Amino acid sequence: MIKPFTTRVILYVLILLLCTAKGFAANPLQAFQATTTPEAVPHFPDRVHTFVFRNWNLVPLERLALVLKTSPENVARVADSLGLPEYQEPAWPTEQIYITLIRRNWHLLPYEQLLELVEMTPERLAFALQEDDFLWVKLGFLKPLCEPLYYQAPDEAAQKRAAAIKKVLQENVGPPLAQKNAVQRFAFIEDLRKTHPDPDFVASDSKALRYIYSYFALYGDTLASDDTEVFSDGLLEKLGRLGVNGVWLHVVLREMAPGGEKFPEFGHGHEKRIANLRKVVEQAKRYNIDIYLYMNEPRTMPNAFFQRADIEGREKIAGAPAPGGYTALCISTPDVQNWIKDSLAYIFSEVPGLGGVFTISGSENHTHCNSHGGWQNCPQCKSKTGAEVTALANALVEEGVHRSAPDAKVILWDWGWNGHGIATDIIEKLPTNIWLQSVSEWALPIERGGVGSTVGEYSISSVGPGPRAQLHWKAAKERGMKAVAKVQLNCTWEIAAVPYVPVMDLIAEHCSNLAECDIDGMLMSWTLGGYPSPNLEISRLFDRTPVPSQAAVLDELAEKRYGKEGAPLARKAWTLMSDAYREYPYSGGVVYNAPVQVGPANLFRPNATGYNATMVGIPYDHLDGWRGHYPPEIFAGQLQKVSKGFAEGIEQLTKAVALAPKPHKYDIEAELRYAEVVQIHFESVANQVHYVLLRDEYAKPETPAARKEEIKKQMRPLVESEIALAKRLYQLTLEDSSIGFESTNQYFYVPNDLLEKIVSCFDLLE
């Protein structure tokens, strides 16, 4: 789940709810109907060639042929004509890459063929669009109206264009596209499955909570399938050695326990989910790791749910209305209160050893009657204050959990309380045997490029804690509660295309600051950032008495990874990159809309598309959506500062790698790759800003002819730079399958996307 905080994203969610009424439409995809014109792809001969290029080696050849209603041989001939690498049977199930497939075919295929490609029923796709981490939001709340796409033998013009593309790729990447020793996508999972028992390892006896998300777990209904791998033994082992003692999972309460007489609709398939949860808990326990369930409850229900005359009192549990024909389950009513408490008590009695839960009770999902501030529209809740309603929603969770598991942790997150403002009025009404969690960096004042603002969340470039978290922790401590900092130590939506951003000075500074606060634990990631990294080790190194200095921790880590000779160079590199990262042009609009996740994989469009950038989905060419509150030139300038500082750091890190002990080469070469990916992405986004500005100026009717000639000259080096960046990033992706991956978005880009960027840029140069 993404937790947006900008007005625009909140509007997205309201529109989503207005567009969906799950389970009541004759056509499950009716709420997601196609309406807009698909984006043109002028650099390919036709749509068939585009489809083959974008899906080659991502799904089985036979399925590509099935979609196009042709033979595998015809599809293979198209791929060969374009100069694509030899066919390799994908080693992953479609479920593991379906989001990537949907996104890259959104403008190519109608729903019927999209369903064939991703092997889904209309019901499953509708569920994915609505429930799988806001996929419909990430696709822009629209489906382009695509004509059916069937194979036709390429005509002479198409053959000629395909041959030109093949020539471009062979001359710039080399036959067979330098993929001979390339790793397949998702190869990192196999690496993370490997265990390496260490008889000398001694687990920390620290009582501090350190919990995180699984790096590669599917976000949706994770426990519904016996075949779903939530995490591997190797991943748990690695996380445990880095001081992690908890992993969290997303669940929906009504799917985890029987609903009883009052809610017979609930609980279908709960037996399997409970059985799988037991297995997960037992697996994690072997590595001294507890499992925590994410509670975002109670979920709203369609209005028809409250109209069942055969269930006594059903109409009385209807609470505040929600958009889209939904209504809250009112937590002021005994039936709903008992259901919440009984369901949680059931889960914790059926799954001994479950670590606990954490709640979000003010998220973008409409849950209890005050989750979006509308408690006064509820007949039962309107006599209470908003703070009382929010506190009650959390108290019910605490009571249910502790009825069966008195020692389980109940972590209450203040996200969204009082519109992200000060919420001490809620804290003072909570039960005291809970842990109060707050985003560390929230409300920090920052200035980037002379532009002032305050931080929301998802920022490594802004070092917490901020004033809101400190005030809330203090209020919690005064009532005898525990306090938890929510942080992102590996990566954020500032850039999520690498497992971790090697800005160790920033991580150490944040951990050091938190060590001075009276807190009891950390949530170390949301769905992004769960990789077992040196950034996590920094947190572990601070978890000692007496607390070491930042310099001591960084020196220790550098020497461990790079040896005595390489350590000083690594430290210098980390400082250069950390200082550069402080210049990141942070804002909610930037982290959600700018092409920071895809870098050079985002195309240079020859003409304005008219499409708005989507939330960590498809950035298109929507510069005004990318830049947030920054003027375009300042936005680009800040990105160039980050890129330049990383380039300087990479020079030092390259020298450090050369001096490092051989046993650590694999890990530190990966660190160097990730630094280079970050540098490439930010240089590319700066290029894209300048390109769009020039392109749009060129397109204005009032632009003089002489100025247009100047613009063309200014655009050429930008296009040439993008070719070079795409070529380098392509090589890096062949070496490391984790580049471009994030669990809820799967692959932001794959190697072929960078080949397409090269092709499109050469087309522009012509």
List where the protein language model places each region.
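Short glycine/serine/threonine/alanine-rich loop segments
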Residues: 70, 120, 244, 287-289, ...
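Bacterial N-terminal signal peptides that target proteins for export
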Residues: 1-11
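Feature activates predominantly on carbohydrate-active enzymes
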Residues: 131, 136-142, 158-362, 367-375, ...
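Alpha-helix capping and helix-loop boundary segments enriched in small/acidic/polar residues
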Residues: 39, 268-275, 327-338, 380-389, ...
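Substrate-binding groove of N-acetylhexosamine-processing glycoside hydrolases
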Residues: 196-207, 217, 228-232, 349, ...
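Bacterial N-terminal signal peptides
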Residues: 9-22
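Long, charge-rich, low-complexity intrinsically disordered regions
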Residues: 27-202
